Regions:
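Transmembrane-helix motifs of polytopic, lipid-linked glycan transferases
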Residues: 89-118, 138, 144, 184
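Short hydrophobic/aromatic helix or loop-helix immediately within or flanking a transmembrane segment
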Residues: 51-85
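Membrane-interface micro-motifs in multi-pass membrane enzymes
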Residues: 124-187
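Start-transfer (signal-anchor) and selected internal transmembrane alpha helices
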Residues: 1-33, 120-133
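Phosphate/oxyanion-binding active-site loops and adjacent basic polyanion-contact surfaces
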Residues: 65-69, 98, 178
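Loop-to-helix entry region of an early transmembrane alpha helix in multi-pass inner-membrane enzymes
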Residues: 81-101, 105, 120-132, 171-176
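Helix-to-loop transition at the C-terminal end of transmembrane segments
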Residues: 32-48, 144-150
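Membrane-interface alpha helices of multi-pass inner-membrane proteins
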Residues: 188, 195-196
């Protein structure tokens, strides 16, 4: 009988869980605040979110969005909390899912490719905390905004995340909503290719 990997191989230390949950709560809170301000068009928080809100509310807009799952999900709660709040919460939840999925796969890879189970408890705690910090670093660094005419790692990323109205790196809710699925596809493709 095959063991459930979540119950055995992917167990994390208490300190690792607490660190992850604390940072997840903090990160999600900050992202929800950002998306909320964007959806309610608070000055200083310009983004494309008003167009997403209009789509959720059923108002015809100037843009076609290629990713309907985001809007279907937002509409589930829009009747209860309104289109603006629903869009903010839905975007934050997809972002939260992406972090959790990344943490799961990073834990899986670390445990598969290292000798985690034979490490001392202290080293396991440090490994769990480092993996958690790497996950959040990936999410924050993946949205870097580079000023115009500058190169980052030798590539010109001028206005890489410009969006329609703003250099806000979290402007594109469609991109944020696809990340959980893209992360799963990435890790599962790596798994298939490594076993092929």
């Amino acid at each position: 009988m095959k063991k459930n990997p979540i119950k055995s191989d992917l167990r994390e230390t208490t300190a690792g869980k607490v660190t992850f949950l604390f940072l997840l709560f903090l990160y999600t809170g900050v992202m929800l605040y950002l998306f909320w301000m964007e959806c309610y068009q608070v000055p200083g928080f310009q983004s494309d979110m008003p167009d997403y809100v209009n789509k959720v509310a059923g108002i015809a807009g100037n843009y076609e969005f290629p990713y309907p799952i985001l809007f279907w999900t937002a509409r589930l709660s829009a009747w209860l909390i309104g289109a603006k709040a629903a869009m903010a919460v839905t975007t934050a939840l997809f972002n939260l899912a992406a972090v959790i999925i990344t943490k799961y796969y990073m834990n899986r890879e670390i445990r598969k490719n290292s000798h985690y189970e034979i490490l001392s408890h202290k080293k396991q705690v440090m490994t769990d905390i480092v993996v958690t910090l790497l996950v959040f670093a990936l999410f924050l660094l993946s949205n870097l905004y580079s000023p115009k005419n500058t190169a980052f790692f030798g590539f010109d990323y001028a206005y890489r995340c410009m969006g329609i109205y703003t250099p806000n790196p979290f402007w594109n809710a469609t991109y944020l909503a696809t990340r959980p699925f893209a992360i799963i596809c990435f890790f599962e493709t790596v798994k298939v290719l490594s076993e092929y």
